[in-house]
């Protein structure tokens, strides 16, 4: 099975400007992500960026680069531009890895592509079990609820499903007994290239605007998303300077 990885790499970031080029163990962060993608067995890895400095650095370490507009509102819009510019066939499997995931396990990059290929869906993703009550109640940890076959019912920053008996009069989060039903969504996606072009034709929805989760546009428009449990739990991504130091420490220890 062949698949293409596209890595969106925005230079402008409100919390950590210039993070694709942040040094981690002697390499820019985007190079770590690129190398992990190559290790997944992808037949093609493309860095999509709106910044010439990122493009120059990426070309220097041997990456294929596609320059994109600075005006995109989401990573999926950036992917759609790449698909159009490079005339990627509609049936090609595209895996979207964020440019701030330098520790992403290559095995789950391939897993999400395999997941899409196995099921009759246009979009697939991964999740991990939630074992910590604080994570369950953290709105930055996106929860996903699926049916018995792994097809997504809903994504939310709220707790889903809501355990009425435990949570109605909850005083201490630490006393929560977690059920197996709680899953945290991992922000890695696989799609058919043609579906990416379809996605950007749909108008943003009230659901996605409320939750700030663009994948809800897919469910709203009647398409199915399949989610599997990730074979390996990914380490921290880089959103802040504190995250960057954590990743540096992890790589230094190894």
Swiss-Prot record:
Annotated keywords: Cytoplasm, Lipopolysaccharide biosynthesis, Nucleotidyltransferase, Transferase
Gene Ontology MF terms: 3-deoxy-manno-octulosonate cytidylyltransferase activity
Protein name: 3-deoxy-manno-octulosonate cytidylyltransferase
Role: Activates KDO (a required 8-carbon sugar) for incorporation into bacterial lipopolysaccharide in Gram-negative bacteria.
Top-rank taxon, per record: Bacteria
Single GO biological process annotation from the record: CMP-keto-3-deoxy-D-manno-octulosonic acid biosynthetic process
EC numbers: 2.7.7.38
